[in-house]
Each structure stands twice: as structure tokens, then as C-alpha cells.
Amino acid sequence: MSGLPSSFDSKEASVDELPFLEKVKFHCKQQPLVPLGTLLTTGAVALAAQNVRTGNKKKAQVWFRWRVGLQAATLVALVAGSFIYGSSLKEKKSEEEKMREKAKMRELLWIQELERRDQETQYRRKRAELARQKMQENEAAVSRLQKELKDLESHIKNEK
């Protein structure tokens, strides 16, 4: 057994190999509130900039305050998501570790079974070889006895 099957490969290694846009999609799926907060913050900044250009200072100030609040909410979502994702990642790693341990145990049991079968095969070959040798010895003894019998028969015929 050459190693662990591909189903045991960690997903983090495959994330590192993804193209940039695929990484963005992956992380957006992991923490959906962060991109939402980023978009809302960007929208608040755009509306504040538009109100500054038109000269509406009060509305610009309101949108800048919204930007600060949305940015804070985004940071809270980022930290909370990292905490939640980190703990679930640890759980996944422990589950993967259990699966690896189980796979190693299966591999060890399979190797032991193969070794046991190999020993049985060697034992049977040894017994077959001993049986062949015994058969050859018996055949030699039978041929000797047949020769002696013929000699005795010829000796008895000669005496008559």
C-alpha cells in the first residue's frame, strides 16, 4: 500500500493551488458576511463622495458615519467568521486525523492478513515438499521390495 488515498488529501492544499478568482469565491463562501459588508461600505463611500460633489454636507456626513459603522460591522464579521471557521477547521482536521488513523489501522490489519496468508502458503508448500520426499522414499522402498520379491520368486523357482 503506497500511501493514503486521494480522498484523504487536505482541502487547504488544494485551496492554495486555486487561481485568484477561485480563491475569492471559496473565501466568500466561507465567510459570506465579509464581502457583503465590503460592498455596503463601498456603497456608503460612493454615496458620501457623490454628496460631497453636489455640496450636500449633511448627507455626506451621514454616509461617512454609515461607512464607519459598516466597516466596523465588516471587521466584526471577519473576526467572528475567522473564529467560527477556525474552530470548524480544527474539528475537520481532527476528523481527518481520525480517518487517517483508521486508514492506517486498516492498512496494518491488511498487511497482517497478507503476512498470515503468506505463512500459510509457505507452510503448505513445505508440507507438500515433505509429502513428495516421503512419497519418493516410499516409491524407492516399494521398488526395493518388488526387486526382493522377484529375487525371492526366482530363487524359489530355481530351488524347485
UniProtKB/Swiss-Prot annotation:
Major localization listed first in the record, in broad terms: mitochondrion
N-terminal signal peptide: none
Protein name: Respiratory supercomplex factor 1, mitochondrial
PANTHER family the UniProt entry points to: HIG1 DOMAIN FAMILY MEMBER 1A (PTHR12297:SF3), HYPOXIA-INDUCBILE GENE 1 HIG1 -RELATED (PTHR12297)
CC terms in the record's Gene Ontology section: mitochondrial membrane
Family: Belongs to the RCF1 family.
Species: Zygosaccharomyces rouxii (strain ATCC 2623 / CBS 732 / NBRC 1130 / NCYC 568 / NRRL Y-229)
Keyword Membrane among UniProt keywords: yes
InterPro entries associated with the record: Hypoxia_induced_domain (IPR007667), RCF1 (IPR050355)
Gene (UniProt): RCF1
Keyword Coiled coil among record annotations: yes
Quaternary structure and partners: Associates with the respiratory chain complex III/complex IV supercomplex.
Lineage, top ranks: Eukaryota, Fungi, Dikarya, Ascomycota, Saccharomycotina
Membrane topology qualifier: Multi-pass membrane protein
